[in-house]
Amino acid sequence: MSSGIQLRHRLDAFQLDAAFEFGNSPGVSALFGPSGAGKSTIINAIAGLIAPEFGRIVINGETLLDTERGLSVPARARRIGVVFQDTRLFPHLDVQGNLLYGSRRAPVKSDASRTAAVVGLLGLEGLLNRRPRTLSGGERSRVALGRALLMNPRALLLDEPLAALDAARKAEILPYLERLVHETQIPMLYVSHSLDEVARLADRMIVIDKGRVIAEGSVFDLSARLDLVAGSPLLPGVILQAKIAAHDEAHALTELELAGESVVVPRIAKAIGETVRIRIDAPDVMLALSRPEGVSANNILPVLVTAIEQTGPNADVQLALKEARLVARITRRSLERLALKPGTAVFAVIKSVTVGGREHL
């Protein structure tokens, strides 16, 4: 393989047996799954912090681990930047000292211009002389990101960097992560069990459960697969890409074009023709056999039922909007009352749409 991960490792009763593509191109691959699935074990193995029983790790053509050949590049020489949820900053150093520690681990020492660029990218200018204990959780996360970037890493591993933050701190740091994704050319593996974070940041998704990869592919394709959410605690929903078609200044609305249909959301500060990612959660989709009249919902879309997955009292219904896919979560009673089956034409009433992390009615 040109680039990718193959790992087998046993830890007490837990068995990891995972293989997936990573590291051949820039962008974010989300390692997605419930707690205890093996995500952090994979991160530690790639970083060289644990030695798996069997493994092959190739990133951008460079072999970092090949147990069959007896090859294992030491962690300090792998040039893998890692950001953990507890940040692991040095408490005795100020922010500038923590950043310089990262630059000292780079193969070529970062010059002042690169350091200034990273400081500016992450908005750290006013924090350089402060100690970690005086920083908010979001500020500490940004410093940890900066330290990892100044290593000039061949890949960046983000192990649930927002898990310890409250909603306000997450909202603070997500825009910086988005800038990082757009302005660097580093392959990133982002560990999360938050579909909202995956929707905003990732291009690809690797779904892991009980130590095994059960699916990998684009976030748009995998988010609509019923088999990946049935019976799991993960909230079903889809991630879609839409294009800004028009702005209604009089009502402070933006009209998005999605598979030839119109989706209306509150005003987005982007130009006509630009693309945006949206997320529609399955519980926010109602189904009707005929187009509802006299309702407050702005978004009512004609769709076709393509698949149904029943779990307990609920039914997840996959819907086709031309080439796009939606998912509705309804009760089994509603499923029976509407007599839904693959091929049934219905209308999807969208109660809310999330754009860029903001929920819109």
Identify what each model region corresponds to.
Residues R131-L135, E139:
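Conserved ABC ATPase signature
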Residues L150-R154:
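A short, proline-enriched helix->beta-strand linker immediately N-terminal to the Walker B motif
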Residues E62-T67, S110-L127, E178-R179:
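Conserved ABC ATPase "signature" region
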Residues S262-E309, R325-L361:
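Glycine/charge-rich catalytic "coupling/switch" loops of P-loop NTPases
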